[in-house]
């Protein structure tokens, strides 16, 4: 593993390795020790007591953060007719049909999220090998395969984030930018925690949130006490 740079080491020294911080303390500290030359993203990582290999312990969904993410999401909507008009009216960046399938196959990726009406999934499905590995495939669980394209586009633009448990049982989510007020970051943090608590699989045994941390784009992780949320 490559040795971290001096700025990272200096940031690390300001974290008490033996302490588990409250959500408020962790967010304040993450903001204080951030050394990026840009408005870095603040991210939370949950280590959950689930077995993702089991179908009944999969966790996936999306949540609208009350204070947004600080990032403007570019939305591509696959729809036709009235639904295409609705998507355009809602502020989608791109709206179309098979012409975008061709563009994406040719390497065009100037979007962050895809929304599709169910009748368009036959077309979008052709892009499975391209979109799947990038996590861009629309999915009913995250509200991106829907007839209500207006709601989908509005929520994404308002600060909707998707979450998904990985093979190791971790869930990562962005909760805003370093420039956000700490209180707004904590409110977003609590929103993510609440939705994950509600998503706890009935089959999950033992401690649900095993580890919890806050970090910035290049910064070290700061341990958080789940009880503080």
Swiss-Prot record:
Where does the signal peptide begin and end? none
What SUPFAM superfamilies does the record point to? Ribosomal protein L1 (SSF56808)
* Record GO biological process: regulation of translation; translation
Q: Which InterPro entries match?
A: Ribosom_uL1_bac-type (IPR005878), Ribosomal_uL1 (IPR002143), Ribosomal_uL1-like (IPR023674), Ribosomal_uL1/biogenesis (IPR028364), Ribosomal_uL1_3-a/b-sand (IPR016095), Ribosomal_uL1_CS (IPR023673)
**Which of UniProt's keywords are assigned here?**
Repressor, Ribonucleoprotein, Ribosomal protein, RNA-binding, rRNA-binding, Translation regulation, tRNA-binding
Q: Which domain of life is it from?
A: Bacteria
State the Pfam families in the record.
Ribosomal_L1 (PF00687)
Give one GO molecular function term.
rRNA binding
**What GO CC annotations are associated with the protein?**
large ribosomal subunit
For this protein, the record's Gene3D superfamilies field holds: 3.30.190.20, 3.40.50.790
Q: Does the keyword Cell inner membrane apply?
A: no
Its subunit composition reads: Part of the 50S ribosomal subunit.
Q: Which PANTHER family match?
A: 54S RIBOSOMAL PROTEIN L1, MITOCHONDRIAL, LARGE RIBOSOMAL SUBUNIT PROTEIN UL1M
| Family that this chain belongs to | Belongs to the universal ribosomal protein uL1 family.
What functional role does this protein have? Binds directly to 23S rRNA. The L1 stalk is quite mobile in the ribosome, and is involved in E site tRNA release.
What NCBIfam families would the database entry show?
rplA_bact (TIGR01169)
Q: Provide the protein name.
A: Large ribosomal subunit protein uL1
């Amino acid at each position: 593993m490559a040795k971290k740079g001096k700025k990272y080491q200096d940031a690390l020294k300001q974290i008490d390795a033996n302490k588990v911080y409250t959500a408020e303390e962790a967010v304040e500290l993450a903001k204080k020790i951030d050394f990026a030359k840009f408005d870095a993203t603040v991210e939370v990582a949950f280590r959950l007591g689930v077995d993702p290999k089991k179908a009944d312990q999969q966790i996936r969904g999306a949540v609208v953060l009350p204070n947004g993410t600080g990032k403007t999401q570019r939305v591509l909507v696959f729809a036709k007719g009235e639904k295409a008009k609705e998507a355009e009216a809602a502020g989608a960046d791109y709206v179309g049909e098979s012409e975008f399938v061709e563009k994406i196959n040719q390497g065009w990726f100037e979007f962050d999220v895809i929304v599709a009406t169910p009748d368009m999934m036959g077309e979008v499905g052709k892009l499975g090998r391209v979109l799947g590995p990038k996590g861009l495939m629309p999915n009913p669980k995250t509200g991106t395969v829907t007839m209500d394209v207006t709601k989908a586009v509005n929520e994404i633009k308002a600060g909707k984030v998707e979450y998904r448990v990985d093979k190791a049982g971790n869930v990562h989510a962005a909760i805003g930018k370093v420039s956000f007020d700490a209180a707004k970051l904590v409110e977003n943090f609590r929103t993510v925690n609440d939705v994950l608590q509600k998503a706890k699989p009935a089959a999950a045994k033992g401690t649900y949130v095993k580890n919890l941390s806050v970090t910035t784009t290049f910064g070290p992780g700061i341990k958080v006490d789940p009880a503080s949320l």
